[in-house]
């Protein structure tokens, strides 16, 4: 039997070729669409208001979280030496240098005082820490448009694992780095610039990894690691830039130091926490909307009747393929046909499913996604339930519009 010749494997790319490919990808990336999406989501999701809420909750939860971390290191004496390393790294990498030392001192002092609290006080601290965790969970699931949340037990289990294992993993990696630095200083006296650069890069990627892990695991939906990493890299770069700008501003314009004196650390810390949360939420938007951005699908701005319009367009597409050999369309196919982001389309599909107008067809074929199919008979199904749900509720004040517009007499076929 004649066998087709094997095609030679493509040679591995050299570093210059990889760099050229990366630059090409960065050049072709939809930067303008990304900026527009960030602006729209910031306004529509009220991320500024959400960041304010998270700033307050974070301020209240800082001491409880540090107390939990200290308790973990106390429970494992073998990791006691990692405690100071981790504390210093977290503060210096996430907080501007101008206030890092004061914040570290305050947190250590307050966390030490927490051990003197009674059972009720400790319980209150834990409730405050859990409140921050649940607020983050609610916010990120809202950005991903997730309707079905994990059970409280699952959320507590996931976040408790993060609170216990996270500090230990970070502490081990940082202690190794600290040991390498100490050893190198003992040999060469002064840390070379190249070593400092590598440490800065390590710090950058550790922050990016932490954010990527949060974007991947927290939303109760499937998030690709590549998308989570894109959001994490944005956050890490944004935090570094924000720290530099805030440090430059505080150095040039010492307004807070003049007004508040030694108390200036508090308002500066609040401003920084707010800015940091804005960056983290924008990173979540990038991770959530990256599939649509890279595929060229535009996010439709919020407008009156948009969900009703998307529902009609969805019904039109499903009716069009009703008699095809392959029944129905997947969510991604619908998003492509309607030129809309899948995150915007998902609540519309849920509404149509609740009305029993469409259904989700799951067939056990390898590599084939579930498809939405038309269930309603357009000629015998009244349009009123959809109008009432997505466009205008039928109430006493709108009764005349409903009657004179003859909306109760319309059926689905009339709008297809």
Swiss-Prot record:
Keywords: Cell inner membrane, Cell membrane, Membrane, Transmembrane, Transmembrane helix. The chain crosses the membrane at residues 60-80, 117-137, 156-176, 187-207, 222-242, 268-288. It is found in: Cell inner membrane. One of its GO terms (cellular component) is plasma membrane. InterPro entries: UPF0761_bac (IPR023679), Virul_fac_BrkB (IPR017039). The keyword Methyltransferase does not apply. It is a multi-pass membrane protein. Its main location: membrane. Pfam families: Virul_fac_BrkB (PF03631). The keyword Metal-binding does not apply. Belongs to the UPF0761 family. NCBIfam families: yihY_not_rbn. This is UPF0761 membrane protein Rfer_2991. It comes from Albidiferax ferrireducens (strain ATCC BAA-621 / DSM 15236 / T118) (Rhodoferax ferrireducens).
